[in-house]
From Swiss-Prot:
GO cellular component terms, A-Z: cytosol; exodeoxyribonuclease VII complex
InterPro entries: Exonuc_VII_S, Exonuc_VII_ssu_sf
Species for this entry: Lactobacillus helveticus (strain DPC 4571)
Keyword presence, Repeat: no
Primary subcellular site in the record, as a coarse category: cytoplasm
Cell compartments where the protein resides: Cytoplasm
Protein name: Exodeoxyribonuclease 7 small subunit
Length: 80
């Protein structure tokens, strides 16, 4: 079961396995419901991570295309 410590790729891999299991239809109903719930949880966590990454990229590149250096001490805010 993925935890918040897992990286994006590990969580994505777990979600893909859940989807494959559910698509195959060889999972008992109770297990399918548990897997579905876990898949929704993972999907939401991945969405948060993607949104955060998009915000960082948006901060690094202004609307006019000007790029900014990323401050390694504060990944959420670019250096001016």
């Amino acid at each position: 079961m993925p935890t918040k410590k897992n990286n994006f790729e590990e969580q994505l891999n777990s979600l893909e396995k859940i989807v494959t299991n559910l698509e195959n239809g060889n999972v008992p109903l109770e297990d399918a419901l548990k897997e579905f719930q876990e898949g929704v949880k993972i999907s939401r966590e991945l969405d948060k991570k993607l949104t955060s990454a998009e915000e960082i990229v948006a901060k690094l590149i202004d609307s006019d295309g000007t790029e900014h250096k990323l401050d390694p001490n504060n990944a959420a805010a670019p250096e001016d």
